[in-house]
Every structure is written in structure tokens, then in C-alpha cells.
Amino acid sequence: MARKFGRRFRRNSRASLPSLKFLTLGSTDSVFGPHNQQHREEEANAPQEIALKPVEENVQTLLGSEGDVECRAPPQQQDYAPTWKCVAIMIALCLAVLCMALDNTILATAIPKITEEFNSVHDMGWYVSAYMLAQSSMTLVYGKLLTYYTVKWVYIAALLLFEGGSLICGVSPNSIALIIGRAISGTGGSGILVSSFLIVTIIVPVEKRPLYNGILSSLYAISGVFGPLLGGAFTDYATWRWCFYINLPVGGVTGFFILLLFRADKPTKQWPTGAVSQLLELDIIGLFLFIPALVSLLLVLQWGGSKYPWDDAHIIALIAVFGVTILAFAAVEYWQQDRATIPPSMIRNRDIWGSLLFTFCLSGSVIIFNYYLPIWFQSIKNASATMSGVMNIPLILAVALTSILSGWAVTTLGYYIPFMYATPVIASVGAGLLSTFKVSSAHPAWIGFQILYGIGVGLGFGLPLVVVQATLTAHTISSGTALVTLTQGLAGALFNFVAQSVFQTKLVQALFAEAPSLDAGKIAEAGATVVRDIVDPDMVPAVLRAYNYAITRVYLVGAALAAAALLGVVPIRWGSVKGKKIEAGAA
């Protein structure tokens, strides 16, 4: 009987179980079952059931000089959504992500009217910061929630928070209500972004995800230009409150499509028994330490050197709070290990930390050009706020279109590493050319250089998420996705303030050199759009040269960051979303 079963098992395993060579030794018990004659006869008569048990845990860990390498068996066939349903769900996701991204920039042209209506100039910084702080601080929270709760309902809850916050902002009777609404919207927006990328992993197979991720990533580039334009249009021709009202019908459409078409999936990890174990699994202690650490850091970056001097007690206290809480958070994460919000094993994975370094550098470069290209157009070319947005369109279109094309190419070819190598090379060249701007630079230069930089950025901007989705197991993808999006936000916040410091320092130096008779401090504080109004006409060329010098020094920071992104690509192993692997590139 044993020989008969062995022959039948080998014949059926060759025919239908090519993945058995990947199974761990522990999984053989599920093949042979209890050691009694009756069970062996039953299994011999039904060999097709053998492969049903190993689904997610068929992983071996090989220890070597390169670190832990996971060899996974090909998963069971998963029923992905049909094409028409994928398209409908993606349209819904894109609408919500676009609204969430627009909320980062749509108030840029509406804030003057808001402060005029509420008489709240002292609060205008919080209209943006409340949204940013809530969005950044909740990113890892959603990453943890998505491990234990169904992504469909986490997404709907986040959407309701975002829409509720938008409604509060739209009907706000005073500045405090507007700030509270912005914080609620940011809390929901964070969940929308993280959940959207996770939904992509559910509705399409891994080889098609780069295209979908590229589409979602391109929306951030689009919102960077159209946010201020849309905000200005609402403010001029209707009311600034429509900056928030517009989210309500769009959110309704998104919610309808997700509820109707997206099948509720099961959580990637099951709850343990016992209240204490459940609290430890959620990493409540780590989250309560991480959120104040992040908020303290962002407040230091926002207030240091502007609202308060760097040696002020407020700034020193915030730095101390950040230092203590971030160290405590690191200790808790090490203690929690696989239950941590950021598992140490994930950080030790060279594909993950390489992707995070790549994301950090590239996002820092992008935020610099998003902010300081319009400043160059307004100060040097005397463009209006609206026209500067129009002049920035070559960059935005290049990033958006190349992100989509890059995603399609990775989907078609399978390999993502070549595009990630191309990004720092092309983007740093484009950024370096942008730093050669002169006061006399004409259309061919500022259009062509923007396009070159945008192509470089677009080639790899969405690929770190592809690396995460191709590298991590099902129950850690949500945390990895949250970590990438958090890194993007932190890089933007940090290098925005670095760029501001470089700009102010170089502007004062250049003004002393070009126009020593002028009050450099007064001109620097006046702003880029009014320089022609506060100096004599014969001094305008000198002031413009000073502004051009200061802005192009900031561009050099962006170029350096784009080049530094190469350091993040080097440790990432050559892999394919189609399951292929180039061994020569693995070292």
C-alpha cells in the first residue's frame, strides 16, 4: 500500500504540484497526515487535496552572507477582478487619491481670502500644517490596522473621515473649526492613500501592479499644478469653501464603486486570543510613542528659525521630546519584533531599506522643485501665481506620463531595477541643468530642462511600492506600503525647510554682493512677487540676479538629492514582478 501511494503521490505531484520543492519540512505532516492505514488509503484515493493546505506559510529562510533570503512557493491561483471591474475600481481610487492630494495644495491660492474672512493671519500656517501633521502621523497606524482588519472597511472608514473633515471645513464658521476639519481630513486622507495601494495588490496580479501604482503616483504630480489653479478659480469665481465641497460628490462616487464592486477580503493576519495579546499585536505602545515623536519633529521644522529662534525654549523642548520618544519607540519596536509597527526584520531587509533611502532622496528633490520652480517664474519672469502654475506644466506632465509609461514597461518586461537606476542619472542631469538658469533664460531652456528632470523622476517615483509588494509577505505589505508613504511625507517636510534655509542664506549673501546699498533683510522678507515694487527701477536687475543665484543654489540641493537616490538602488536585489531573478545582480 505504501508503494502504491508513493507511486501515485509522485505521479500526481509531478502533474499538479510543481511547487512542492519549496515546502518546508514542517509542511510534510499536512501531506502524509496521521500515521494510520485508514487515512493513508483515503489520501491515496484523493491526492488532489494534498496541495490545499500550504498557502501562505510555505516559506523557507536561507541564511547566508547576503542575509535572510526568503524562497516562497508560488501561491495558489487567486481570483483577481476582471478587467472591467479593475478599471471601475481604479477610477474610484484615482478620484479619491486625487482629492486627497489636491488638499495638500489647493489652499495655496485660497488662504488670503480665508484669512481675510476670519481675520486670522496668525492661523494661516495651521491650515496646511494641521492636514500634513494628521496625515503623516496616522500613516503607520493605518498600516497596522490593515493587517488585522478588512481593507475594504478600513478604506470606507478613512473615506468617511476625509469627507467629514471636508464638510466641517466647508461650513466652518471660524478659523478653529477650519483647523479641526483639516486635521480630520488629514487623518482620513492618510488611510485613503495607504489603502488604495493595498487594494491594487488585491485586484491585480503582481506583474500588473507597476502600471496601476504608476497611475496612482502620477496623481500627486498632477495635483501639484492643478491644486493652486483650482483653488484660485473657486476663490475668484465662487467661494473658497468649494475647495472642500468638491470632495463630497467625488467621495460619494468613490464610496459607491468600492462598496458595490470591491469584494470584501479577509484580513492578512488573524487576531490572537486575549486582550493583552491583542494590544501587543496592535503595538499600541509603539504608536503612542511614534505619533508625538513625529509631531514634535514636524513642529521643530516648521517653527525653528521662523516663529521661534532655534535656541528658544519651545524649540529645545520639542527637540528633547522628539529625541526621547523616538528612542523609546525604537526600543519598543525591537522588543515587539514581528508584532512591531515597523518590524526590525523589515528594516534589515536590504530591498526595503534601499527602497526607503531611494524614496527619501527622490521625494526631497521633487518637493524642492515643486516649490521653487514657481518662485523662479514669479520673481525672475514676473509671472502671476496662476501663470507660474501654467509654466510648471511641462514638469508635471513629464512626471505623470512617464510614471504611467514606466509602470506599463515594468508590467510588460517584469524588471524594475533598470528604471530605478535610470531615475537618479536622468533626474540629476535635469536638475543640474535647471540650476544653470540665468535671468535671461528663455522658453527652450526652462521647458526642456523641466521635461528632462520630469522624465527622470517619473521613471522611478512609484517603483519603491512595487519593490515592497514584490518582496514582503501578504501580512506585512500594508506596513511596508505605509512606511514608503511616510518616508515620502517626511522627506518633503524636511527638505522643504532645508531649501528655505539655503534660499534665505544665499539671497542675503547675493544681495550684499549685488546691491550693497539696499536693505537685504527687508528685501528678503518682502517676498519674491513684490521685489519690483520696493526697489528703484535701476536696481531691479541686481536684485533679480541675487534672486536667481539664491534659487539656483536651492536647485543644486535638489540635484544632489536626485543623485543620492542612486545609493538606495544599489542594495536592492535584481528581481522581477513576473517571478524571474537575475542571479548576477543579486550580490
Curated annotation (Swiss-Prot):
Glycans are attached at N382. CDD domains: MFS_Azr1_MDR_like (cd17502). Its main location: membrane. The chain crosses the membrane at residues 87-107, 124-146, 153-173, 184-204, 214-234, 242-262, 284-304, 315-335, 357-377, 393-413, 414-434, 447-467, 483-503, 554-574. InterPro entries: MFS (IPR011701), MFS_dom (IPR020846), MFS_trans_sf (IPR036259). It is found in: Membrane. GO terms for molecular function: transmembrane transporter activity. PANTHER family: MAJOR FACILITATOR SUPERFAMILY (PTHR23501), MFS EFFLUX TRANSPORTER INPD-RELATED (PTHR23501:SF199). MFS-type transporter; part of the gene cluster that mediates the biosynthesis of oxepinamides, derivatives of anthranilyl-containing tripeptides that share an oxepin ring and a fused pyrimidinone moiety. This is MFS-type transporter opaD. The gene is opaD.
